[in-house]
């Protein structure tokens, strides 16, 4: 009986969201230069053609100095009529004919906490927040692979609670970085909509990469990067076919380059991505250079090569400081590597991949057994098996980056220091 009541409550909560709120799926994404700008994404019913965004600093308690800008929505049917699941487990087809808004706001103050809200003639959203960059010192949460799925809300809750654990470890955070697979099926718009109602999406700028699950439909047919693209408002500075999916931005002294592994499966796709990365690095000098993709660098269970040999030579050439990934659901971090060998800190790229964080889809391996491959490269591995939850805290200063792996209870499992590479 208790289970039935819980399901009914979930259905009532999630089913009412679109009907009661004319403004949905609000999220802040980085602009190319996060010192002065931010990208805000939201959607409305197609009957609403324009909306205002009102923003000001958090110190402006009465919104007296708020700026207001009007943006027009663009009709979006990317997710319409796709097969999906409701919170009660019932099958349905998404009915998503919306106007989508990608708002770039600029002229912001650096290193400042802002608040914002969306306003239509019918509705005013809750207040959301983001922080601009500008300080050499900042902190973020890194998380991935929580596979948000309407019938199993505990997946989302596990990940959001884990972000809370990182907040307790070091508060305040400046933003959140995800490494893909934050939805079970990216083609199910209701999954994104429900996810964006969570508190961490209200409180932070989020940047992320397209995971294979974010790229797929429930039927695994008609998969496309448009699901990821239209769920946020990432910078349109990628390459052909990847605008708003592959992108780069700067936060403080760090250049982040975000890749889409789904379009790098072929050698041709890989070459296009690598040529773009070369151009981005050449045109955007930075103390730290971080490349992110979803697929793992090594297979965590045995250490076997995965994406590492596809990228390591280019990373060596470009002086990439840190390479981040997810997908394998087993944490692994390496020593600094260059030319396939372990080198001194500041002389090579550090590779790290995250675990899953949904307490359900983790991967098991015997950590007591000696690792079979690349044991000299990989310094630490960790997993809890199927029910794994973890995230990383990232602290950046002018001298180094420190990445700390935390378990669900806030216990420190691994600390990796990453230093700028001097070419």
Language-model-detected regions and their locations in the chain:
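Extended active-site neighborhood of metal-dependent phosphoesterases/phosphodiesterases
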Residues: 95-104, 113-129, 190-285, 310, ...
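Mobile, glycine- and charge-enriched loop segments
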Residues: 135-148, 269-306, 358, 419
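Bacterial Sec-dependent N-terminal signal peptides
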Residues: 1-22
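Acidic/histidine-rich helix-loop elements
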Residues: 59-96, 140-160, 220, 230-237, ...
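Active-site-proximal segments of metal-dependent phosphoesterases and phosphodiesterases across multiple
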Residues: 263-266, 284-325, 374
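Acidic, histidine-bearing metal-coordination/catalytic regions of metal-dependent phosphoesterases
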Residues: 19-148, 393-423
């Amino acid at each position: 009986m208790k289970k039935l009541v819980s399901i009914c409550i979930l259905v009532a909560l999630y089913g009412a969201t679109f009907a009661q709120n004319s403004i949905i799926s609000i999220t802040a994404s980085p602009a190319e230069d996060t010192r002065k700008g931010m990208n805000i994404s939201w959607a409305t019913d197609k009957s609403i053609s324009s909306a205002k965004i009102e923003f000001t600093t958090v110190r402006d308690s009465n919104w007296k100095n708020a700026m207001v800008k009007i943006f027009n929505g663009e009709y979006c049917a990317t997710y319409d009529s796709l097969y999906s699941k409701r919170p009660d487990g019932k099958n349905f087809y998404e009915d998503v004919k919306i106007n989508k808004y990608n708002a770039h706001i600029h002229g912001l103050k650096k290193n400042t906490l802002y608040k914002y809200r969306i306003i239509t003639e019918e509705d005013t959203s809750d207040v959301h927040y983001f922080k601009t960059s500008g300080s050499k010192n900042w902190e973020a949460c890194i998380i991935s692979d929580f596979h948000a799925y309407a019938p199993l809300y505990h997946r989302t809750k596990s990940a959001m609670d884990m972000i809370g654990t990182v907040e307790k470890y070091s508060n305040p955070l400046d933003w959140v970085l995800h490494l893909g697979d934050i939805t079970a099926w990216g083609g199910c718009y209701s999954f994104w909509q429900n996810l964006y109602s969570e508190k961490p999406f209200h409180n932070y700028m989020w940047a992320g990469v397209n995971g294979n699950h974010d790229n797929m439909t429930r039927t695994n047919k008609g998969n496309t990067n448009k699901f990821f693209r239209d769920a946020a408002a990432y910078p349109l500075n990628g390459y052909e076919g990847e605008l708003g999916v592959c992108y780069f931005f700067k936060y403080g002294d760090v250049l982040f380059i975000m890749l889409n592994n789904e379009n790098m499966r072929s050698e041709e796709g890989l070459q296009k991505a690598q040529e773009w990365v070369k151009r981005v690095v050449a045109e955007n000098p930075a103390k730290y250079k971080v490349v992110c993709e979803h697929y793992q660098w090594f297979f965590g269970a045995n250490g076997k090569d995965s994406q590492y040999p596809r990228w390591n030579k280019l990373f060596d050439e470009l002086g990439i400081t840190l390479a981040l990934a997810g997908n394998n659901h087993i944490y692994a971090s390496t020593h600094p590597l260059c030319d396939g060998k372990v080198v001194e800190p500041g002389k090579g790229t550090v590779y790290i991949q995250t675990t899953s964080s949904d307490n359900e889809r983790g991967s098991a391996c015997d950590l007591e057994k000696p690792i079979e491959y690349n044991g000299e490269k990989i310094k630490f591995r960790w997993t809890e098996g199927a029910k794994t939850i973890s995230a990383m805290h990232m602290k950046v200063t002018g001298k180094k980056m420190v990445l700390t792996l935390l378990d669900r209870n806030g216990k420190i499992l691994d600390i990796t220091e990453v230093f700028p590479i001097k070419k």
